[in-house]
Protein backbone atom coordinates (compact mmCIF):
# COMPACT_ATOMS: atom_id res chain seq x y z
CA UNK A 1 0.00 0.00 0.00
CA UNK A 2 1.35 3.39 -0.95
CA UNK A 3 2.16 5.74 1.91
CA UNK A 4 1.23 9.35 1.29
CA UNK A 5 1.55 12.32 3.59
CA UNK A 6 0.66 15.98 3.60
CA UNK A 7 1.36 18.71 6.13
CA UNK A 8 -1.29 21.41 6.34
CA UNK A 9 -1.05 24.87 7.87
CA UNK A 10 -4.04 27.17 7.92
CA UNK A 11 -5.48 30.10 9.87
CA UNK A 12 -9.18 30.44 10.68
CA UNK A 13 -10.37 34.01 11.11
CA UNK A 14 -13.71 34.87 12.71
CA UNK A 15 -15.71 38.10 12.47
CA UNK A 16 -19.10 38.61 14.15
CA UNK A 17 -21.33 41.69 13.98
CA UNK A 18 -24.65 42.85 15.46
CA UNK A 19 -24.76 40.39 18.31
CA UNK A 20 -22.53 38.87 20.96
CA UNK A 21 -21.33 35.35 20.31
CA UNK A 22 -18.20 33.33 20.87
CA UNK A 23 -17.91 31.49 17.57
CA UNK A 24 -19.90 30.35 14.55
CA UNK A 25 -22.86 28.08 15.23
CA UNK A 26 -22.82 28.96 18.93
CA UNK A 27 -19.59 27.06 19.63
CA UNK A 28 -16.85 28.09 21.99
CA UNK A 29 -13.47 27.92 20.30
CA UNK A 30 -12.43 24.69 22.02
CA UNK A 31 -15.76 23.23 23.19
CA UNK A 32 -18.57 21.27 21.60
CA UNK A 33 -21.23 22.07 24.20
CA UNK A 34 -24.57 23.18 22.85
CA UNK A 35 -26.50 25.95 24.59
CA UNK A 36 -30.04 27.13 24.07
CA UNK A 37 -30.60 30.53 22.56
CA UNK A 38 -32.68 32.84 24.77
CA UNK A 39 -36.17 33.68 23.57
CA UNK A 40 -36.32 37.33 22.52
CA UNK A 41 -39.25 39.56 21.63
CA UNK A 42 -36.96 41.54 19.33
CA UNK A 43 -35.47 40.26 16.13
CA UNK A 44 -31.72 39.77 16.15
CA UNK A 45 -29.43 39.54 13.14
CA UNK A 46 -26.02 37.93 13.56
CA UNK A 47 -23.38 37.90 10.84
CA UNK A 48 -20.41 35.61 11.28
CA UNK A 49 -17.74 34.08 9.14
CA UNK A 50 -14.32 32.53 8.96
CA UNK A 51 -11.50 31.93 6.48
CA UNK A 52 -9.20 28.92 6.13
CA UNK A 53 -6.21 29.77 3.93
CA UNK A 54 -3.96 26.72 3.64
CA UNK A 55 -0.49 25.68 2.61
CA UNK A 56 -0.29 21.97 1.78
CA UNK A 57 2.67 19.76 0.98
CA UNK A 58 2.46 16.19 -0.26
CA UNK A 59 4.50 13.33 -1.62
CA UNK A 60 4.25 12.74 -5.35
CA UNK A 61 1.10 10.62 -5.32
CA UNK A 62 -0.69 12.52 -2.55
CA UNK A 63 -4.11 14.07 -3.10
CA UNK A 64 -4.25 17.62 -1.79
CA UNK A 65 -7.38 19.67 -1.09
CA UNK A 66 -6.18 22.93 -2.67
CA UNK A 67 -4.52 23.74 -5.97
CA UNK A 68 -4.10 21.65 -9.11
CA UNK A 69 -3.01 17.98 -9.07
CA UNK A 70 0.66 17.07 -9.22
CA UNK A 71 1.94 16.73 -12.81
CA UNK A 72 5.07 14.80 -11.76
CA UNK A 73 4.22 11.88 -9.41
CA UNK A 74 7.92 11.13 -8.88
CA UNK A 75 8.44 14.39 -6.95
CA UNK A 76 6.78 16.02 -3.96
CA UNK A 77 4.72 19.17 -4.47
CA UNK A 78 3.03 21.98 -2.55
CA UNK A 79 0.06 24.30 -3.02
CA UNK A 80 -1.47 27.45 -1.51
CA UNK A 81 -5.24 27.92 -1.52
CA UNK A 82 -8.32 29.18 0.27
CA UNK A 83 -9.91 25.93 1.45
CA UNK A 84 -12.99 27.57 2.99
CA UNK A 85 -14.43 31.04 3.35
CA UNK A 86 -17.79 30.97 5.09
CA UNK A 87 -20.14 33.94 5.50
CA UNK A 88 -23.21 33.26 7.60
CA UNK A 89 -26.35 35.35 8.19
CA UNK A 90 -28.62 34.23 11.04
CA UNK A 91 -31.82 36.00 12.07
CA UNK A 92 -33.73 35.00 15.22
CA UNK A 93 -37.12 36.20 16.42
CA UNK A 94 -38.74 34.62 19.47
CA UNK A 95 -38.77 30.86 18.77
CA UNK A 96 -38.05 31.10 15.05
CA UNK A 97 -34.81 31.61 13.17
CA UNK A 98 -33.48 31.62 9.62
CA UNK A 99 -29.94 30.94 8.40
CA UNK A 100 -28.20 31.54 5.07
CA UNK A 101 -24.54 30.61 4.67
CA UNK A 102 -22.29 30.74 1.61
CA UNK A 103 -18.81 29.36 1.03
CA UNK A 104 -16.10 31.04 -1.04
CA UNK A 105 -12.98 29.06 -1.95
CA UNK A 106 -10.33 28.81 -4.64
CA UNK A 107 -11.47 25.25 -5.40
CA UNK A 108 -15.27 25.60 -5.79
CA UNK A 109 -15.85 29.33 -6.20
CA UNK A 110 -19.02 30.60 -4.50
CA UNK A 111 -21.55 27.98 -3.42
CA UNK A 112 -24.53 27.79 -1.08
CA UNK A 113 -23.84 25.93 2.17
CA UNK A 114 -26.97 26.46 4.29
CA UNK A 115 -30.39 28.01 3.76
CA UNK A 116 -33.02 26.94 6.26
CA UNK A 117 -35.66 28.03 8.73
CA UNK A 118 -35.99 26.65 12.25
CA UNK A 119 -39.20 26.94 14.27
CA UNK A 120 -39.66 25.78 17.88
CA UNK A 121 -42.95 25.55 19.76
CA UNK A 122 -42.99 28.02 22.72
CA UNK A 123 -44.97 25.97 25.24
CA UNK A 124 -42.89 22.88 26.05
CA UNK A 125 -39.80 24.22 24.23
CA UNK A 126 -39.17 20.64 23.17
CA UNK A 127 -40.35 20.21 19.58
CA UNK A 128 -38.92 21.97 16.54
CA UNK A 129 -39.10 21.86 12.76
CA UNK A 130 -36.22 22.65 10.43
CA UNK A 131 -36.63 22.94 6.66
CA UNK A 132 -34.36 23.90 3.78
CA UNK A 133 -30.72 23.03 3.06
CA UNK A 134 -28.78 21.92 6.14
CA UNK A 135 -26.47 19.24 7.53
CA UNK A 136 -27.75 15.68 7.42
CA UNK A 137 -28.50 14.45 10.97
CA UNK A 138 -26.25 11.40 10.86
CA UNK A 139 -23.69 10.93 13.63
CA UNK A 140 -21.42 13.61 15.08
CA UNK A 141 -18.72 14.70 12.62
CA UNK A 142 -21.06 15.75 9.81
CA UNK A 143 -22.62 18.46 11.99
CA UNK A 144 -19.33 19.57 13.57
CA UNK A 145 -18.39 22.95 12.13
CA UNK A 146 -15.09 23.30 10.27
CA UNK A 147 -14.31 26.28 12.50
CA UNK A 148 -14.09 24.10 15.63
CA UNK A 149 -13.25 20.65 14.28
CA UNK A 150 -9.90 19.36 15.55
CA UNK A 151 -8.75 18.21 12.09
CA UNK A 152 -8.75 20.18 8.81
CA UNK A 153 -10.98 17.64 7.03
CA UNK A 154 -13.71 15.18 7.91
CA UNK A 155 -13.06 11.44 7.86
CA UNK A 156 -12.83 9.93 4.37
CA UNK A 157 -16.06 7.95 4.69
CA UNK A 158 -18.28 11.03 5.08
CA UNK A 159 -17.61 12.81 1.76
CA UNK A 160 -18.10 9.43 0.07
CA UNK A 161 -21.48 8.68 1.67
CA UNK A 162 -22.61 12.28 2.27
CA UNK A 163 -21.04 14.62 -0.34
CA UNK A 164 -21.13 18.28 0.77
CA UNK A 165 -22.69 17.12 4.09
CA UNK A 166 -25.90 19.03 3.30
CA UNK A 167 -29.17 18.03 1.69
CA UNK A 168 -32.60 19.49 0.91
CA UNK A 169 -35.23 18.38 3.39
CA UNK A 170 -37.39 18.86 6.45
CA UNK A 171 -36.56 17.57 9.91
CA UNK A 172 -38.33 17.14 13.23
CA UNK A 173 -36.14 17.92 16.25
CA UNK A 174 -37.10 16.73 19.73
CA UNK A 175 -35.01 17.85 22.70
CA UNK A 176 -36.27 19.06 26.07
CA UNK A 177 -34.85 22.28 27.59
CA UNK A 178 -31.88 22.04 29.96
CA UNK A 179 -34.06 22.46 33.06
CA UNK A 180 -35.96 19.27 32.17
CA UNK A 181 -34.76 15.80 33.30
CA UNK A 182 -35.41 14.65 29.72
CA UNK A 183 -32.86 17.02 28.17
CA UNK A 184 -30.33 14.18 28.08
CA UNK A 185 -32.24 12.51 25.23
CA UNK A 186 -32.61 13.95 21.73
CA UNK A 187 -34.09 12.87 18.42
CA UNK A 188 -33.63 14.21 14.89
CA UNK A 189 -35.67 12.64 12.09
CA UNK A 190 -36.19 13.99 8.61
CA UNK A 191 -37.06 13.41 4.97
CA UNK A 192 -34.49 14.50 2.37
CA UNK A 193 -34.11 14.64 -1.41
CA UNK A 194 -31.09 12.33 -1.24
CA UNK A 195 -28.80 13.95 -3.83
CA UNK A 196 -27.20 16.68 -1.75
CA UNK A 197 -27.66 20.32 -2.66
CA UNK A 198 -28.38 19.53 -6.32
CA UNK A 199 -31.90 20.00 -7.65
CA UNK A 200 -34.31 17.28 -6.51
CA UNK A 201 -34.67 14.87 -9.44
CA UNK A 202 -37.18 12.16 -8.44
CA UNK A 203 -40.29 11.43 -6.36
CA UNK A 204 -38.44 9.21 -3.89
CA UNK A 205 -37.30 10.72 -0.61
CA UNK A 206 -34.71 9.45 1.87
CA UNK A 207 -35.17 9.10 5.62
CA UNK A 208 -32.45 10.00 8.14
CA UNK A 209 -32.78 9.62 11.90
CA UNK A 210 -30.40 10.18 14.82
CA UNK A 211 -31.19 9.27 18.44
CA UNK A 212 -28.74 10.63 21.01
CA UNK A 213 -28.19 10.42 24.75
CA UNK A 214 -25.75 12.51 26.79
CA UNK A 215 -25.11 14.57 29.89
CA UNK A 216 -22.57 16.94 31.44
CA UNK A 217 -20.98 16.89 34.88
CA UNK A 218 -18.35 19.05 36.60
CA UNK A 219 -15.32 17.43 34.97
CA UNK A 220 -16.84 14.89 32.62
CA UNK A 221 -19.34 14.83 29.77
CA UNK A 222 -20.47 12.19 27.35
CA UNK A 223 -22.71 11.74 24.36
CA UNK A 224 -23.68 8.59 22.47
CA UNK A 225 -26.03 8.02 19.59
CA UNK A 226 -27.33 5.79 16.84
CA UNK A 227 -28.19 6.82 13.27
CA UNK A 228 -30.15 5.24 10.44
CA UNK A 229 -30.36 6.13 6.75
CA UNK A 230 -32.94 4.59 4.41
CA UNK A 231 -32.84 5.89 0.87
CA UNK A 232 -32.84 5.12 -2.82
CA UNK A 233 -30.62 5.57 -5.87
CA UNK A 234 -32.00 5.61 -9.41
CA UNK A 235 -30.88 2.72 -11.64
CA UNK A 236 -29.79 4.19 -14.98
CA UNK A 237 -29.61 0.93 -16.94
CA UNK A 238 -31.13 -2.53 -16.84
CA UNK A 239 -27.92 -4.06 -15.43
CA UNK A 240 -27.38 -4.38 -11.68
CA UNK A 241 -24.22 -5.89 -10.14
CA UNK A 242 -24.65 -7.19 -6.57
CA UNK A 243 -21.57 -8.13 -4.53
CA UNK A 244 -21.45 -11.71 -3.21
CA UNK A 245 -18.76 -13.79 -1.49
CA UNK A 246 -17.42 -14.85 -4.90
CA UNK A 247 -17.62 -11.50 -6.67
CA UNK A 248 -20.24 -9.39 -8.37
CA UNK A 249 -23.38 -11.21 -9.51
CA UNK A 250 -24.77 -9.54 -12.64
CA UNK A 251 -28.48 -9.34 -13.39
CA UNK A 252 -29.62 -7.83 -16.68
CA UNK A 253 -33.29 -7.06 -17.13
CA UNK A 254 -34.69 -4.08 -19.09
CA UNK A 255 -37.26 -3.57 -16.33
CA UNK A 256 -34.45 -2.72 -13.87
CA UNK A 257 -33.96 0.63 -15.59
CA UNK A 258 -35.93 3.30 -13.76
CA UNK A 259 -36.18 1.28 -10.57
CA UNK A 260 -34.40 2.27 -7.38
CA UNK A 261 -31.59 0.52 -5.52
CA UNK A 262 -31.72 0.53 -1.73
CA UNK A 263 -29.29 2.87 0.03
CA UNK A 264 -29.12 1.85 3.69
CA UNK A 265 -26.71 2.95 6.43
CA UNK A 266 -26.39 2.27 10.15
CA UNK A 267 -24.20 4.32 12.44
CA UNK A 268 -23.08 4.47 16.06
CA UNK A 269 -21.27 7.39 17.66
CA UNK A 270 -19.83 8.34 21.04
CA UNK A 271 -17.92 11.27 22.52
CA UNK A 272 -16.32 11.49 25.97
CA UNK A 273 -14.66 14.56 27.48
CA UNK A 274 -12.53 14.59 30.64
CA UNK A 275 -11.13 17.58 32.49
CA UNK A 276 -8.04 17.04 34.67
CA UNK A 277 -5.12 19.08 36.00
CA UNK A 278 -3.38 18.40 32.67
CA UNK A 279 -6.19 19.90 30.59
CA UNK A 280 -9.22 18.70 28.66
CA UNK A 281 -9.14 15.38 26.82
CA UNK A 282 -11.67 14.38 24.16
CA UNK A 283 -12.21 10.85 22.85
CA UNK A 284 -14.64 10.58 19.95
CA UNK A 285 -15.48 7.89 17.44
CA UNK A 286 -18.04 6.65 14.93
CA UNK A 287 -18.70 3.33 13.20
CA UNK A 288 -20.83 3.02 10.05
CA UNK A 289 -21.92 0.07 7.93
CA UNK A 290 -24.57 -0.76 5.36
CA UNK A 291 -25.25 -1.06 1.63
CA UNK A 292 -24.05 1.54 -0.87
CA UNK A 293 -25.21 1.77 -4.51
CA UNK A 294 -22.50 3.09 -6.79
CA UNK A 295 -20.88 2.64 -10.18
CA UNK A 296 -17.99 0.52 -11.40
CA UNK A 297 -15.54 3.37 -10.82
CA UNK A 298 -16.96 5.04 -7.72
CA UNK A 299 -18.77 4.27 -4.47
CA UNK A 300 -19.64 7.93 -3.91
CA UNK A 301 -23.27 8.90 -3.30
CA UNK A 302 -25.05 11.04 -5.93
CA UNK A 303 -24.80 14.80 -5.41
CA UNK A 304 -26.01 16.27 -8.71
CA UNK A 305 -29.36 16.88 -10.36
CA UNK A 306 -28.52 14.50 -13.22
CA UNK A 307 -29.88 10.96 -12.95
CA UNK A 308 -27.27 8.16 -13.22
CA UNK A 309 -26.86 6.66 -16.69
CA UNK A 310 -24.49 3.78 -15.86
CA UNK A 311 -24.83 0.29 -14.38
CA UNK A 312 -25.58 0.04 -10.67
CA UNK A 313 -23.11 -1.69 -8.32
CA UNK A 314 -24.34 -2.70 -4.85
CA UNK A 315 -21.56 -2.99 -2.27
CA UNK A 316 -21.61 -3.74 1.48
CA UNK A 317 -19.39 -1.19 3.26
CA UNK A 318 -18.10 -0.26 6.70
CA UNK A 319 -15.85 2.38 8.18
CA UNK A 320 -15.42 5.11 10.74
CA UNK A 321 -12.82 6.87 12.86
CA UNK A 322 -11.34 7.24 16.33
CA UNK A 323 -10.06 10.64 17.47
CA UNK A 324 -8.09 11.65 20.56
CA UNK A 325 -7.60 15.36 21.27
CA UNK A 326 -6.11 17.21 24.22
CA UNK A 327 -6.19 20.90 25.19
CA UNK A 328 -3.04 21.47 27.26
CA UNK A 329 -3.85 23.18 30.57
CA UNK A 330 -2.80 26.84 30.94
CA UNK A 331 -1.50 26.99 27.37
CA UNK A 332 -3.05 28.00 24.04
CA UNK A 333 -2.07 24.68 22.45
CA UNK A 334 -4.06 21.58 21.49
CA UNK A 335 -2.91 18.21 20.17
CA UNK A 336 -4.85 15.66 18.12
CA UNK A 337 -4.39 12.15 16.74
CA UNK A 338 -6.87 10.40 14.47
CA UNK A 339 -7.35 7.11 12.66
CA UNK A 340 -10.04 6.75 10.01
CA UNK A 341 -10.90 3.90 7.66
CA UNK A 342 -13.33 3.24 4.80
CA UNK A 343 -13.88 -0.22 3.33
CA UNK A 344 -16.19 0.28 0.32
CA UNK A 345 -16.56 -3.48 -0.24
CA UNK A 346 -16.35 -5.72 2.82
CA UNK A 347 -16.59 -8.91 0.75
CA UNK A 348 -13.23 -8.47 -0.97
CA UNK A 349 -9.72 -7.96 0.40
CA UNK A 350 -6.08 -8.78 -0.19
CA UNK A 351 -5.31 -10.95 -3.21
CA UNK A 352 -9.02 -11.22 -4.07
CA UNK A 353 -9.04 -7.59 -5.18
CA UNK A 354 -9.23 -7.51 -8.97
CA UNK A 355 -11.16 -10.77 -9.27
CA UNK A 356 -14.90 -11.30 -9.67
CA UNK A 357 -15.36 -7.91 -11.31
CA UNK A 358 -13.76 -5.96 -8.45
CA UNK A 359 -11.19 -3.21 -8.87
CA UNK A 360 -9.53 -0.20 -7.27
CA UNK A 361 -12.96 1.20 -6.33
CA UNK A 362 -13.36 -1.74 -3.94
CA UNK A 363 -10.02 -1.21 -2.14
CA UNK A 364 -9.89 -0.39 1.57
CA UNK A 365 -8.64 3.10 2.47
CA UNK A 366 -7.18 4.15 5.80
CA UNK A 367 -5.38 7.17 7.20
CA UNK A 368 -3.55 8.23 10.36
CA UNK A 369 -3.24 11.90 11.24
CA UNK A 370 -1.41 13.98 13.84
CA UNK A 371 -1.77 17.68 14.44
CA UNK A 372 -1.32 20.68 16.70
CA UNK A 373 -3.33 23.89 17.04
CA UNK A 374 -2.21 27.23 18.46
CA UNK A 375 -5.17 29.26 19.75
CA UNK A 376 -3.54 32.67 19.46
CA UNK A 377 -6.75 34.55 20.27
CA UNK A 378 -10.46 34.11 19.90
CA UNK A 379 -11.02 33.54 16.20
CA UNK A 380 -7.41 33.00 15.11
CA UNK A 381 -5.75 29.59 15.23
CA UNK A 382 -2.93 28.26 13.02
CA UNK A 383 -3.03 24.47 12.59
CA UNK A 384 -0.32 22.03 11.51
CA UNK A 385 -1.53 18.58 10.49
CA UNK A 386 0.23 15.56 8.99
CA UNK A 387 -1.78 12.95 7.11
CA UNK A 388 -0.37 9.45 6.49
CA UNK A 389 -2.20 7.11 4.15
Residue ranges and their predicted role:
Residues 1-31:
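Cleavable N-terminal export/targeting peptides
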Residues 1-3, 185, 386:
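N-terminal start-of-domain structural block
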Residues 26-27, 60, 73-74, 116-119, ...:
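Outer-membrane beta-barrel pore domains
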Residues 34-64, 72-196, 201-208, 212-219, ...:
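Outer membrane beta-barrel
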Amino acid sequence: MTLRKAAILFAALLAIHTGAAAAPDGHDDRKEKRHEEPVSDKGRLKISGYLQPQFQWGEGDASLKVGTPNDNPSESFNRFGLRRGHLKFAYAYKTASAVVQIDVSTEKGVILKDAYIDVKEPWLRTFGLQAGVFNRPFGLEIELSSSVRETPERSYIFPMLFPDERDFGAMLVIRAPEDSPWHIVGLQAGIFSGNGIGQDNDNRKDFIGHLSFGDEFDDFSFRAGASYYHGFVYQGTGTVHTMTDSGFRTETDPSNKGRYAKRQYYGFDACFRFETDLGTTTLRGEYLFGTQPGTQTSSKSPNTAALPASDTYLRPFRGGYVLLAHDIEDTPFSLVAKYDVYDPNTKVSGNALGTGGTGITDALRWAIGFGATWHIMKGLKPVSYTHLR
